[in-house]
Amino acid sequence: MTDKRKDGSGKLLYCSFCGKSQHEVRKLIAGPSVYICDECVDLCNDIIREEIKEVAPHRERSALPTPHEIRRHLDDYVIGQEQAKKVLAVAVYNHYKRLRNGDSSNGIELGKSNILLIGPTGSGKTLLAETLARFLDVPFTMADATTLTEAGYVGEDVENIIQKLLQKCDYDVQKAQRGIVYIDEIDKISRKSDNPSITRDVSGEGVQQALLKLIEGTIAAVPPQGGRKHPQQEFLQVDTSKILFICGGAFAGLDKVIEQRTDTGRGIGFNATVKGSADKATEGELLSNVEPGDLIKFGLIPEFIGRLPVVATLRELSEEALIQILREPKNALTKQYQALFNLEGVELEFRDEALTAIAKKAMARKTGARGLRSIVEAALLDTMYDLPSLESVDKVVIDESVIAGQSEPLLIYGKHETQQASGE
């Protein structure tokens, strides 16, 4: 089609749909014996968009995965944490089922089930939230609770979280309202003491108060396209009651709070019960018994805990679990580096003892799965630096001594059928 103002005879042209002349519109597009103006094109686009919106909810309702399907998908990417995956699968399924049925069933209002994840660093809290959002194909954003402050103070306003979510979906409010927000380091905004303070705590209890309404459900007014707020502008209205909030934190020291509550038979003096190290519960076992009172004693306010009714605890990853993480998930770290080396036409092999050494090193650093990448990256750095300049390398082998820093990776050359260290 071409843009036409007049035909060859100089005759005045009109839109075949609305009847407006070429002088009344900005553009007139010509087809075979027919014309359409820019205004009619815009109208057609609006009609199509509205029809897509009406059809989408029915499509979504039929496509809602079951808890078993959600759990199976999490199993593909997250090793261990079986109970946490089951809790998450049920909570997420119920949340989106509530959205698809209009927040109520037979006149009964369905409550919102935000989630609190408790577990040590590198146990998979963030990965679980990211994997869920990717599987459900919903917008996802992360926020760090330590950067948040009350409105009016220097720092990040809690409403900026919603703005980040809108940015992820090009400011489509309907999409944003189906999204997932993960707030990390939530334990760092615990108040500094059990007793309410008369002084302001703008990064602790004050932030909990600011997050209350956002997490429970409110209409957040967000400036369009990330601009600053000013009285004359129109705001985007986002209903946060439809957004799933997942809060996560390590809660270091919470196990001691739980131990004090559960260890009722300690006694004093000659009546004290002496427990050996074998009798003591592990941190993971203690955290699995967490109750709202323990979180209040830790420093979260009761109102905030009430907005996070679903609690899932994650255990510290064992050496065996770390080895599985290196090898088994669909996007396992070893598979990622093997794909990277394949781009150079080189095969990368990790021997079993190398994976064990990587896991032991991560355990010693107490960084969980998060520390695995830095260990592998350090071991492969020199090889990745040299490899593009080397010819005829067919294979690179990583063993235990490479991870320990005692030798260089083994390079196997195709043409000469010799084995050399990359440093030679």
From Swiss-Prot:
Binding site for Zn(2+): 15, 18, 37, 40
Binding positions (ATP): 120-127
Highest taxon, organism lineage: Bacteria
UniProt entry keywords in alphabetical sequence: ATP-binding, Chaperone, Metal-binding, Nucleotide-binding, Zinc
Annotated GO CC locations: HslUV protease complex
Protein's GO biological process: cell division; proteolysis involved in protein catabolic process
PROSITE patterns recorded: CLPX_ZB
Keyword Zinc among record annotations: yes
Pfam families: AAA_2, ClpB_D2-small, zf-C4_ClpX
ClpX-type ZB domain span: 2-56
CDD domains, sorted: RecA-like_ClpX
Signal peptide: none
Function according to Swiss-Prot or TrEMBL: ATP-dependent specificity component of the Clp protease. It directs the protease to specific substrates. Can perform chaperone functions in the absence of ClpP.
Quaternary context: Component of the ClpX-ClpP complex. Forms a hexameric ring that, in the presence of ATP, binds to fourteen ClpP subunits assembled into a disk-like structure with a central cavity, resembling the structure of eukaryotic proteasomes.
Protein family membership: Belongs to the ClpX chaperone family.
NCBIfam families reported in the protein's UniProt record: clpX (TIGR00382), PRK05342.1 (NF003745)
Protein name: ATP-dependent Clp protease ATP-binding subunit ClpX
